[in-house]
């Protein structure tokens, strides 16, 4: 059986933690930030953990992991 390919969009957007969780960057911080307050910009600077329901789907798209 041939090797499974990883979805290229998953390679660009997600990282796996050592415990098996999936991290991603928070959306909404590329442009038009002048209309948002400092709290919004600060909170969107960090990475976030994907919910457990979507976790299974993303792991299926990256069968051999990403790290």
UniProtKB/Swiss-Prot annotation:
SUPFAM superfamilies: L35p-like (SSF143034). It comes from the Bacteria. This is Large ribosomal subunit protein bL35. GO terms for molecular function: structural constituent of ribosome. It comes from Zymomonas mobilis subsp. mobilis (strain ATCC 31821 / ZM4 / CP4). One of its GO terms (biological process) is translation. GO terms for cellular component: ribonucleoprotein complex; ribosome. The keyword Ribonucleoprotein applies. InterPro entries: Ribosomal_bL35 (IPR001706), Ribosomal_bL35-like (IPR021137), Ribosomal_bL35_CS (IPR018265), Ribosomal_bL35_sf (IPR037229).
């Amino acid at each position: 059986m041939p090797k499974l390919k990883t979805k290229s969009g998953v390679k660009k957007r997600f990282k796996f933690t050592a415990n098996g969780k999936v991290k991603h960057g928070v959306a909404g911080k590329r442009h038009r930030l002048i209309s948002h307050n400092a709290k919004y910009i600060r909170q969107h600077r960090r990475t976030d953990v994907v919910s457990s329901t979507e976790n299974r789907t993303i792991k299926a798209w990256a069968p051999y992991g990403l790290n």
